[in-house]
Amino acid sequence: MWENKFQKEGLTFDDVLLVPAKSEVLPRDVSVKTKLTETLQLNIPIISAGMDTVTEAKMAIAIAREGGLGIIHKNMSVEEQAEQVDRVKRSESGVITNPFFLTPDRQVFDAEHLMGKYRISGVPIVDEDQKLVGILTNRDLRFIEDYSTLIDDVMTKENLVTAPVGTTLKEAEEILQKHKIEKLPLVDESGTLKGLITIKDIEKVIEFPNSAKDSQGRLIVGAAVGVSADTDVRVAALVEAGVDVIVIDTAHGHSKGVLEKVKAIREQYPDLTIIAGNVATAEATRDLIEAGANVVKVGIGPGSICTTRIVAGIGVPQITAVYDCANEARKHGVPIIADGGIKYSGDIVKALAAGGHAVMLGSLLAGVSESPGEREIFQGRQFKVYRGMGSLGAMEKGSKDRYFQENNQKLVPEGIEGRIPYKGPLHDTIHQLVGGIRAGMGYCGTKTIDELRENTQFIRITGAGLRESHPHDVQITKEAPNYTL
């Protein structure tokens, strides 16, 4: 150990470039799909970080519609996090198999509350045997002033249009158009409510053809958990809400508590997709895989708001960390996620080529309108608040267990709080990032991300090479949408 105290040199994104290769591939022809598990496939290799200024339900919905995956952060109560997951799963669906419903003896107030909370325009009404007896929509409530009125007095009861279980979206669309309605309840032979198809869901399928969805046609979503006292309860609530993947998210994934928690969750939920991290070595990757992780998340200290490497003196430069972990993970057929340090779309290409199956982004997404960070004005420009989960504010709110700390009065932060420029809708940012990925794959002559990972080579560059890579000897007069200094 002592003789090998100083290991190899560590490299990060600015230390390397990919070598261009002979190519018969155009950027528009490449596939940016990536497979994390048999049941979890992304249409773009981008995951939004489980940070309290990056991902809540609004972001998770938006990025899933783009083809990626959002991880709901854990700085909230168990009930609130489960509700956020439920909101994503209910945001759109080919067929809603467990629609909300009310009974005729409930009040209009209850319907208004339910419809407002989940932003839905109507709700089926069933009797005590779950048989459909009516439907209540915004039109029925438009002129109601007394919210204590019973639903039975205002709902539509006559000439209900329904369809049998098994009706396809195409068939449902024809029925909806024919009868000029927006909601189509699905019932069995006895009239029991079994599902719901809405015109909005059909429109969303057309509007967002690249959406990442589960086997039931619902958007996919993940959620972060730690190794705190409420982890078991939190995981149970998230699974009940329909979460697609659990991220066991800690600053040091190669610790006894994390390994034991991964093993315990795997034993409790054999079919649950588990992403575990963060790690930066091959040994840590192997131990997490053996404990039961389906996917390993790599990155200790590379994030723009992370100070772990400065405060604790710990870390491995990200390109080296990704490569080392991927070298081990490929022996087990397990994918890895490169988490942190990515500033440009070119860094995503490098992370994937170094061994990543997907990347997790924080700062590149925190400035979009769908992120939960507060918007503020500074020196005449719009910004959004962005902070590390190791910052004082985030740790005081609930993420201190991620850094294995307990005392709120004596926290030692490993992150900072700041602001980043406001970027507008997520779609515009994703368009630029995916466009950069496609361009990089075209230069390398690789049609798929698997080929990018297997058939590319890096070249190390000097400081002069890095300066040459950026715009130089010119004053930028118009900011590009995908490049800032």
Curated annotation (Swiss-Prot):
Keyword Repeat set for record: yes
PROSITE patterns registered for this protein in UniProt: CBS, IMP_DH_GMP_RED
InterPro entries, A to Z: Aldolase_TIM, CBS_dom, CBS_dom_sf, IMP_DH, IMP_DH/GMP_Rdtase_CS, IMP_DH_GMPRt
Reported cofactor(s): K(+)
Known pathway: Purine metabolism; XMP biosynthesis via de novo pathway; XMP from IMP: step 1/1
Main EC class the enzyme belongs to: oxidoreductase
Family: Belongs to the IMPDH/GMPR family.
Assembly and interaction partners: Homotetramer.
HAMAP family, alphabetized: IMPDH
Protein known as: Inosine-5'-monophosphate dehydrogenase
Organism: Halalkalibacterium halodurans (strain ATCC BAA-125 / DSM 18197 / FERM 7344 / JCM 9153 / C-125) (Bacillus halodurans)
Lineage: Bacteria, Bacillati, Bacillota, Bacilli, Bacillales
